[in-house]
Swiss-Prot record:
Signal peptide: none annotated. It catalyses: N-terminal L-lysyl-[protein] + L-leucyl-tRNA(Leu) = N-terminal L-leucyl-L-lysyl-[protein] + tRNA(Leu) + H(+); N-terminal L-arginyl-[protein] + L-leucyl-tRNA(Leu) = N-terminal L-leucyl-L-arginyl-[protein] + tRNA(Leu) + H(+); L-phenylalanyl-tRNA(Phe) + an N-terminal L-alpha-aminoacyl-[protein] = an N-terminal L-phenylalanyl-L-alpha-aminoacyl-[protein] + tRNA(Phe). Pfam families: Leu_Phe_trans. InterPro entries: Acyl_CoA_acyltransferase (IPR016181), Leu/Phe-tRNA_Trfase (IPR004616), Leu/Phe-tRNA_Trfase_C (IPR042203), Leu/Phe-tRNA_Trfase_N (IPR042221). One of its GO terms (cellular component) is cytoplasm. The keyword Ribosomal protein does not apply. NCBIfam families: aat. GO terms for molecular function: leucyl-tRNA--protein transferase activity. The keyword Cytoplasm applies. This is Leucyl/phenylalanyl-tRNA--protein transferase. It is found in: Cytoplasm.
Length: 235
């Protein structure tokens, strides 16, 4: 049994999360900035489907990627050097989250509900949520979005309509964060794709201990739209 949250973000300790399903901690509550910031600082994130209440998660172990340790294969480095894609930051956040929300298969569902989209658009307006976009011939063909809090980045979702488009976005994000001394990219759930890019699992207690440092340090929230791909050297 998990607790039902009501009018304030009083999350239970993450150690009380279920082991099956892994990380389910609480239900209910809201998706206001106050709730989201309180959750992320504690290593908690919302994830649920249409028709369900808001569900809050903190899985153990946690998949993370240190920005400096991203694994760039020879073929990906060739793509990056060739600058086939134009990479932009925070110029099409609403479109990125819309593309991420599109079902992966015909008739499939999505956890990026209209309520989730509205909540993260608000966080983007406040300078906390960001997008990294891969453009090809003027078309948005890949990208990702997530939350930055202090020196921690919490990845939410990515999409790709052209081969390597999301990998290029992730590579630029990692380099951008490394240059700004970010401590971690939280990948939340383990996937083969992220493992292949250099992500690894750590214990939840280690992750949450790091958040106590990372989320109170670093720059204040602000848009990243002034960043250009010309800042990055892939040689």
């Amino acid at each position: 049994m998990i607790p039902w949250l009501t009018d304030r973000p009083a999350f239970p300790p993450v150690e009380r999360a279920l082991t099956e399903p892994n990380g389910l901690l609480a239900a209910g509550g809201r998706l206001t900035p106050e709730w989201l910031l309180a959750a992320y600082r504690r290593g908690i994130f919302p994830w649920y489907s249409d028709g369900e209440p808001i569900l809050w998660w903190s899985p153990d172990p946690r998949l993370v990627l240190q920005p400096a340790q991203i694994r760039i294969t020879r073929s990906l480095r060739k793509v990056l050097r060739g600058r086939r894609f134009e990479v932009r930051f925070d110029t099409a956040f609403a479109r990125v989250i819309e593309e991420c929300a599109a079902p992966r298969e015909p008739g499939g569902g999505t956890w990026i509900t209209p309520e989730i989209r509205a909540a993260y658009l608000r966080m983007h307006e406040l300078g906390y949520a960001h997008s990294v976009e891969s453009w090809l011939d003027g078309r948005l063909v890949g990208g990702l979005y997530g939350m930055a809090l202090g020196r921690a980045f919490f990845g939410e979702s990515m999409f790709s309509r052209v081969s390597d488009a999301s990998k290029v976005a992730l590579a630029h994000l990692a380099r951008f964060l490394e240059q700004r001394d970010f401590g971690v990219i939280d990948c939340q759930m383990t996937t083969p794709h992220l493992l292949s890019m250099g992500a690894h699992e750590i214990a939840r207690r280690e992750f949450c201990a790091g958040l106590e440092r990372w989320t109170v340090e670093g720059p204040p929230p602000a848009k990243w739209s002034g960043t250009t791909a010309a800042e990055f050297d892939w040689n």
